[in-house]
C-alpha cells in the first residue's frame, strides 16, 4: 500500500480507533475507494508516557515509538501522525528517525486555535490557551514549547483542577466510565476564569468527552486537539473535508 497515512497509535487504543473514525467521517467521499488509505500500529503495550516523563517509571516508550514510525515508513506511508499529545514529548526523536514527514498535533492545534479565534461570531485574538492534558504533558511543557514561537501563552489548571483532569483521563475514560458534563464544564469554566481565550482538549482521551457531550456545539472556545489532527490529516492527504 503506497501513499498511505501511517498512524502511530495505541497511545491509547480507544483514542486511536476514534481518530480513525474521525478521519473517515471528515473525508468528502461517496464510495470506499475515495477514502484515505491508513496503516495503523495500535501498539497498546507501549510503556506509559506520563509515568516515564514524571520519573515514576524507568521504562522509556521512545524506542517502541521510533520502531513503529520506522515500520510505517518501510510499509510505504507518505507521512505519520501520532494521536497522542503526551507522546509529543518524544516528537523530535520520532521525527528524526524517519525520512517522511510527521505531523505535530500540538503545532497543528495551536495554529488552528489562532485561526479559529478570528473566525468566531465575535472575533477574538488568541493570546492565552488553557491546556487540559495529562500530568506528563503539563509537566513537560510541550504546549508552552510550541506556543511561545507562535506568540501564545499556554497555561495549566490549578493543582486541584489538574487532579480532576487526571481522574477523568485515568480513572474514568481509560477505565471505560463516562464523565459528566458538570465535571468537565467545571474545569473549562476554571480555565475561562484564568483569562484563557480558548481551552484545548490536550489529551486524546478527553476527545471522547468532547464527542460524547457534543462540546463543539455548545462551547465555541473549546478545541479538540484530536479533531484538529484528523482535519489536518485529511487535508495533507490531498482530500476535501466533508461539509
Write out the residue ranges for each language-model feature:
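Non-catalytic structural scaffold of enzyme domains
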Residues: 1-243
